[in-house]
């Protein structure tokens, strides 16, 4: 039987007051005069409707991240880097969110993973007076925004748990403005703050924990430039377990007498699909949408990526890893890696799963930047359902000296493996029985020995690794704090 269709819902008023009503406008004007609508204009500029009935958490976070001008570091569609619900999948698969919705802890995890600074509180960890102070703080600033998760029933609305940004506050009336992302259902509306607290102070049946609110602001550092961890592939749980449990056990239980032996033990037991877990961040663009030259912005980002890559190559750990991999006949193919990246790029640009694509051919070429500097571009011909699309992949490279002269080197398994080992917590190596070797290994991965840009890259990976570890252990609902480095 076909489901009956619905066109919006009537907003129960009271207790809510429609933002666009005469009274709603008056409340807005009063709050504007008092300075507690400062965050509203940023939020309303990026306000969106959730694209799926259960995407309220993803839509709310997307609105806030874009309002804060946080760069996602990867493209959404065409040439544009932009947060969209479809990109918020590092802590919970989109298929699961689409079917079941998302919990408070998982949205907090997503905000951390997306590079934001987050302070999150359940009502059991705060008071209504503290909540009111936080609302005033966020609504009085353009640099901090709040997302609330609450039960609709308290407002006599249909539905249960919901997420939405808080867009303003009227102190005289003690009312908060909810920018409801389910705009197909209810418009933005004012509610008494005490009632909002009551709606948050309810139990989420899926977790058994109280709901709450989070304050989101720009980070002190931007997300990673060259590397990122991903849980899009189901194998990430196996890989995270290997890194967290198996590596410390392997290096403590087996006889290791050199750094190369440690690398050998870790590498030879590494799950074969580890490259689905840690990836280099590729710059993708549709060929026909771009000219043949690098833009100033593309050149700037590529230059930073190349600097990070150069710093990885200059670490002592990379030299050990490169030496070991050369003895086992490990080889990397730029065209193979690029073909995979082109398929993933086509997935992002089209919104279709990458398994529906195949890369028929690739072509490596050099193109000019604004100041005649060169960049490497791999053009891939991606095929889906018989239709072809050309995708450009901008590849960072560094120059290395060999017997025949300067040679370009690109992101490959050796530097990715180096970044992964640098991201592991220092205590990973504490079980090495040879004290001198343990000290040497800890020196190799010490943050103090790394240049500033690479330090930030490694800190980003460590942060992601800790967040994914929380998800793997189902602790994201218990631990809402930012990861400790």
Curated annotation (Swiss-Prot):
Is-annotated flag, keyword Flavoprotein?
A: no
Gene3D superfamilies for the chain: Phytochelatin synthase, N-terminal domain
Q: What is the effect of changing residue 220 to A?
A: Decreased activity
Q: Null phenotype?
A: Plants are highly sensitive to Cd (20- to 40-fold) and AsO(4)(3-) ions, sensitive (eightfold) to Ag ions, slightly sensitive (twofold) to Cu and Hg ions, and insensitive to Zn, SeO(3)(2-) and Ni ions.
Q: What does the UniProt induction comment state? A: Induced by copper, and by cadmium during the early stages of plant development. Gradual decrease of cadmium induction as plants continue to grow, and by 15 day after germination, total loss of induction.
Give the consequence of mutating residue 56 to S/A: Loss of function
Recorded catalytic reaction(s): these are: [Glu(-Cys)](n)-Gly + glutathione + H(+) = [Glu(-Cys)](n+1)-Gly + glycine
Sorted alphabetically, the keyword list is: Acyltransferase, Cadmium, Copper, Metal-binding, Transferase, Zinc
First-tier enzyme category under EC:
transferase
What's the effect of swapping residue 189 to A? Decreased activity
The GO terms this record gives for MF are: ABC-type phytochelatin transporter activity; ATPase-coupled arsenite transmembrane transporter activity; cadmium ion binding; copper ion binding; glutathione gamma-glutamylcysteinyltransferase activity
Q: How is its activity regulated?
A: Requires cadmium for activity. Also activated in vitro or in heterologous system by Ag(+), Hg(+), Zn(2+), Cu(2+), Fe(2+) or Fe(3+) ions, but not by Co(2+) or Ni(2+) ions.
Task: Name the Gene Ontology biological process terms.
Answer: arsenite transport; defense response by callose deposition in cell wall; defense response to bacterium; indole glucosinolate catabolic process; phytochelatin biosynthetic process; response to arsenic-containing substance; response to cadmium ion
Pfam families noted in UniProt: Phytochelatin, Phytochelatin_C
Q: Where expressed (tissues)?
A: Expressed in roots and shoots.
Q: Where is the Peptidase C83 domain?
A: 1-221
- Active site feature: 56, 162, 180
Additional free-text comment from the UniProt record: Homoglutathione (hGSH) is a good acceptor, but a poor donor, of gamma-glutamylcysteine units.
Q: What is known of its domains?
A: The intermediate part (284-372) is important for enzyme stabilization.
Question: Which family, according to UniProt?
Answer: Belongs to the phytochelatin synthase family.
Q: What does this protein do?
A: Involved in the synthesis of phytochelatins (PC) and homophytochelatins (hPC), the heavy-metal-binding peptides of plants. Also involved in glutathione-conjugates degradation.
Instruction: Return the protein name.
Output: Glutathione gamma-glutamylcysteinyltransferase 1
Organism expressing this protein natively: Arabidopsis thaliana (Mouse-ear cress)
Lineage of the native species? Eukaryota, Viridiplantae, Streptophyta, Embryophyta, Tracheophyta
């Amino acid at each position: 039987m076909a489901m009956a269709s619905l066109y919006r819902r009537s907003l129960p008023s009271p207790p809510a007051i429609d933002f666009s009503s005469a009274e709603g406008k008056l409340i807005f004007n009063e709050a504007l005069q008092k300075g507690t609508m400062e965050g509203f204009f940023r939020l309303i500029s990026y306000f969106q409707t959730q694209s799926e009935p259960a995407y309220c958490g993803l839509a709310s976070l997307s609105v806030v991240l874009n309002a804060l001008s946080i760069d996602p570091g990867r493209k959404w569609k065409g040439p544009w880097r932009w947060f969209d619900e479809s990109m918020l999948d590092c802590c919970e698969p989109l298929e699961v969110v689409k079917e079941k919705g998302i919990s408070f802890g998982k949205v907090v995890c997503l905000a951390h993973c997306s590079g934001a600074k987050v302070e999150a509180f359940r009502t059991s960890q705060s008071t209504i007076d503290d909540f009111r102070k936080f609302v005033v703080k966020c609504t009085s600033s353009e640099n901090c925004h709040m997302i609330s998760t609450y039960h609709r029933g308290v407002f006599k609305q249909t539905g249960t748990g919901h997420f939405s940004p808080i867009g303003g506050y009227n102190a005289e009336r003690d009312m908060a403005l909810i920018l409801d992302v389910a705009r197909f259902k209810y418009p933005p509306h004012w509610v008494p703050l005490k009632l909002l607290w009551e709606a948050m102070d309810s139990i989420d049946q899926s977790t058994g924990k109280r709901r709450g609110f989070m304050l989101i602001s720009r980070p002190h550092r931007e997300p990673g430039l060259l590397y990122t961890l991903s849980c899009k592939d189901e194998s990430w749980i196996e890989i995270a377990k290997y890194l967290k449990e198996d590596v410390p056990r392997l290096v403590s239980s087996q006889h290791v007498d050199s750094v190369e032996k440690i690398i050998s033990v870790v590498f030879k037991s590494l799950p074969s699909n580890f490259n689905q877990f840690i990836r280099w961040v590729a710059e993708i663009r549709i060929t026909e949408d771009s000219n043949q030259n690098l833009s100033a912005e593309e050149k700037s980002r590529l230059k930073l990526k190349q600097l990070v890559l150069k710093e990885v190559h200059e670490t002592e750990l990379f030299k050990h890893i490169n030496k070991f991999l050369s003895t086992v006949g490990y080889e990397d193919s730029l065209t193979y890696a690029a073909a995979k990246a082109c398929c993933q790029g086509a997935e992002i640009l089209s919104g279709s799963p990458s398994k529906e694509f195949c890369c028929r051919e690739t072509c490596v070429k050099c193109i000019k930047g604004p100041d005649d500097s060169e960049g490497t571009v791999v053009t891939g011909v991606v095929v889906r359902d018989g239709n072809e699309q050309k995708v450009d992949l901008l590849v960072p490279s560094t120059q290395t000296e060999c017997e025949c002269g300067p040679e370009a080197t690109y992101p490959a398994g050796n530097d990715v493996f180096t970044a992964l080992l640098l991201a592991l917590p220092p205590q990973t190596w504490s079980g090495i029985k040879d004290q001198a070797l343990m000290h040497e290994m800890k020196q190799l991965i010490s943050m103090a020995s790394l240049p500033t840009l690479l330090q930030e890259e490694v800190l980003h990976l460590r942060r992601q690794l800790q967040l994914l570890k929380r998800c793997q252990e189902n602790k994201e609902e218990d631990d809402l704090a930012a990861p400790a480095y």
